[in-house]
Amino acid sequence: MAADWEEIRRLAADFQRAQFAETVQRLSERNCIEIVSKLVEDKKLDVVHTLDGKEYVTPAQISREIRDELYMHRGRINVVDLQKIINVDLVHVEGRANEIAKSDRGTQLILGQLIDEAYLDRLAEEVNDKLQEAGQVNIAELCKTYDLPGDFLTEALNARLGRVIQGQLDQYNRGMIFTQAFLSRHKACICGLFSGITRPTQINNLLNLYGFQENLVYSMLEELVNSARLKGSVVGGRQDKAIYIPDIYSKAQSTWVESFLKQNGYLEFESLTRLGIPDPINYIKKRFKSSRLLFLKTACVGRTIVDQLEASVEEAINSATWVDLQPMLPSILSEEDVGILLNEVLRSMNVQSSARLLSTSVVSEKFIAGCIALFEDLMQQKAQKEVKNNPVFLITEDDVKQSSALLETSASSKKDKRDERRKKAAEGGGSVKSGGGGNAREIRIRKTKKKGRKEEDSDEETTHSSQGRNKLGDVQFLSVEEIVEVLEEKVCDSSEEMLQELAEQLQRPLSKMYQEVVTTAFLSTSSSGAGGSRKKNMKDLQEEINNLYNNIRLFEKGTKLFSDETQATVAKHVLKTVCTDVTNVLLSFVAAEHMTSDSSAAMTSEIRLKILAKLSDEVRSPLMKLHNSLNGKAIEEFLSCLETSAEECGLFLKKGDKKRERQALSVHRQALCEQLRDAEDPALVLHLTSVLLFQNVTHCMLHAPGRCVPHIIGFLQSKIPEDQHKLLSQYQSLVVKQLVVQGHGAEKKTVPPEGAGGPADSDDTESLQRELHSLSRDIKDTVLAQRKPSVTE
C-alpha cells in the first residue's frame, strides 16, 4: 500500500509540474493585433481601440462610461471633456453621445454638451430662487450665466412654469419672467402714476424716469384704460412717441378750441400743436364737421371773417374805390395765407373782372381806370418829347416787317431791274460813276428803302400800325417811383404801401398805352417829313461811306508793312476807330430807313445791338456780322462784312483808283500837317511826325495808336536820313522821360512822400520842358519844311 501511495504522490507531482510548466508555442502581440483587425474588418467583432493603442473598447462600454460621466458631472458634460476621459477618438464619442440623446428622452445634446432632465430641474429651481428674490428675471441674462441658447432655455423654463418656477412669462416679451406679486406691484405703480397726470405726457419719458418695463407699461396701461380704471387714452400705440392724454385735459382742450374759434373766428395750427394735438388739421375736421371752415397753410378761418371780407369787397366795388383788408385779417396769418384767403374770397364772389387784389388791398377796376386817366396829359407831352429826342428806338422789328409788307407790291415791280443790275455788276460791266474807271465795283443787290408809303391805302396802314403798337416794349413811360409821386398828388386818401402796389400794377398798362401814343405821334410826324431831302441825304451818305471804306483799305495797306504783332495792334486800333465810325454811319442810315426817321443818337455798342434787334432777319444777319467783326483782329474780315452789309442796304461801294488814292493820301497828309502845326503836346508831336514820315517814305496811310510809335520809329531807321532818325530817337527818349516824370508827379499828389525834395524835382522838370520845346520845332520841320506834294503826284 505504501508503494501505491508513493506512486500516487509521484504522479500528482508530475501533473502539477505539467500544469505550471510554460508552453513553448504562443501568439505574439502583433499577431493578436492582426487577428483583431481582421475580425473588425470582416465585421465579426465591433471594438474601438483607445488613443494610446493599448486597449480595445466596445461601443456598449463607451455608452456606459458616457452615462457614468454624465451622472458624475451632475447632468451636464461637454463632449470634448468626455473624449479626454474615455480616451477614444472624438468621432466615436460624438456618435455614442448622439445615440444616447436619441434613445434617451431625458438626455439632450445641446451645442456639444450632454444635458439631462435632472440638470434642467436643478437649473429651474435656481431660476425660481432668483425670481422670488427679484420679482423678475431676464432670460437673456440667464443665457449668459448658464451658457445656453435662448430658445432652448426659454422652452425648458416655460415647461417648468407653475411646477418648478412660480411665475409667468411676459406675453409681449417672452424674454422676461415675472412673479404675480411683482406684476401687481407694478400695476399699482402705473395706475397711481397715470392717475395723477393732468396733461399730455410722453410715455417714453416716464419709462426713463421711473424705470418701468416698457412692455408691462403698455399692456397694463391698455388694460387699465379699457377697464375704465384710468380716464384717458393712449395716442401712438406702442411707439417711442406714444402719448397718454387724460380725459380731463381733452375736455379742457376741446372747450378752449371751441371758445377760441367762436371769439376770434380762426384757429392756428401751431397753437393746437402746442396744446398737445399732434394732427391739428384732422382734429379740426373731426371736431367741427358741420362748420364751413377755410383751411390755409398755417391756420383755418371761420365764416365770420370770410363774410366780413366779402362785405368790404362788395362795398369797394360798388363805390368804385378801394379797401385795405389788413385790419380785418388775423395777425397770425402769413403772407402766403393772406394771399390764399383773399383770392378765395374774390373767387367765391366771382368779381375777378371787377376788382384787383394788391397785396392786402382790393381795388376796383373803375378806380384803376380813373388812375390811368390821370396820366393821359403827361403821356402826350412825354411822347412828343420822345419823338423829337430819340426816334430811333421807337419802332420794333414787327413794325419793320409790317412796313416792309406795305411796300412789298411796289418793291416787286423793281425786282427785275435789280436782278439785271446785279448780273451786270457780277460781269464787271455795270454803270460807273464819279470817275471810278474799270476798277470800280458797283454793289447793288437789294434795296429796302420804304418809298411809296403815301401810295398805300390809309385804312390798311392804320390796320397794320395798330397791330404793331401792342408789341412795343422798349420805351418806358415812368418808373414805379415816378408813378407813386403822381398818385400821391392826385389820390390823397391812400397809404404809401397801397400806392406802391398800385404803381406797380399801373406801370405795365401805362407803358403799353404810352407805346401806342408814341407810335401814333411818331408815325404822324414821320408821314409829314420832308421826303424830298432824302435823295440828297442818300448822296451824302454814299460819298461818306465810300470815303471811309477807301480810307480803311489804305490803312490796311500801311498796316501790312509791320511785323505780325504790330500789325495786330494797329488793326485793332483801326477797327475800334475808323471801322467803328463807318459801322455807326451805316447803322444810322439803316435805322433811319427802316424806322422812317433820319435822326440818330450817339452810337455805342449797346445802341448798335438795340438797333439790330429791331431789324428784319435778312437785314440783321449781315449787319450783326459787321458789328461782331469790330471785336476781331483782321481788317480784311471787316471789309468783307462791310461790303456784304452795304450790298444788303442798297449802297454802292467803289474801290478807288490810283488817282483817288493819291487824292486821299494828299488830303490825309494835309490834315495831319494842320494838326502838327497846332500841336503843343510833345507826345502828340512825336506821334504825328512819325506817321507823316511813314507816309512820306512808304506812300501809305497809317492809323496807329500811340503805343506803336516806337515801332514806327524803328521801321523808319533804314528809310530816313540818319540825322533825322537820331533826332526822332532823342525826342522819343525825352517824351518817355516826361511821361515818367508826370506819372511820378501824379503819385506824389495822391500820397505825399516824407521829406520830398521839391526844388530839385522842379528844376529837372523845367529843364526837360525847355529841351523838349527846343527840339519840337526841329521835329516839326522834318515834315513841314519838306515841299508839299502835288495832288497828281
Curated annotation (Swiss-Prot):
GO terms for cellular component: cytoplasm; cytosol; endoplasmic reticulum; endoplasmic reticulum membrane; nucleus; site of double-strand break. Residues 2-212 are annotated as: Required for E3 UFM1-protein ligase activity. One of its GO terms (biological process) is DNA repair. It is found in: Endoplasmic reticulum membrane; Cytoplasm, Cytosol; Nucleus; Chromosome. One of its GO terms (molecular function) is UFM1 ligase activity. Its main location: endoplasmic reticulum. Transmembrane segments: none annotated. It is an enzyme of class 2 (transferase). The keyword DNA damage applies. Residues 427-439 have a biased composition (Gly residues). Residues 767-781 have a biased composition (Basic and acidic residues). Keywords: Chromosome, Cytoplasm, DNA damage, DNA repair, Endoplasmic reticulum, Membrane, Nucleus, Transferase, Ubl conjugation pathway. Its EC number is 2.3.2.-. It comes from the Eukaryota. Belongs to the UFL1 family. E3 protein ligase that mediates ufmylation, the covalent attachment of the ubiquitin-like modifier UFM1 to lysine residues on target proteins, and which plays a key role in various processes, such as ribosome recycling, response to DNA damage, interferon response or reticulophagy (also called ER-phagy). As part of the UREL complex, plays a key role in ribosome recycling by catalyzing mono-ufmylation of RPL26/uL24 subunit of the 60S ribosome. Catalytic component of the UFM1 ribosome E3 ligase (UREL) complex. Interacts with E2-like enzyme UFC1. This is E3 UFM1-protein ligase 1. The gene is ufl1.
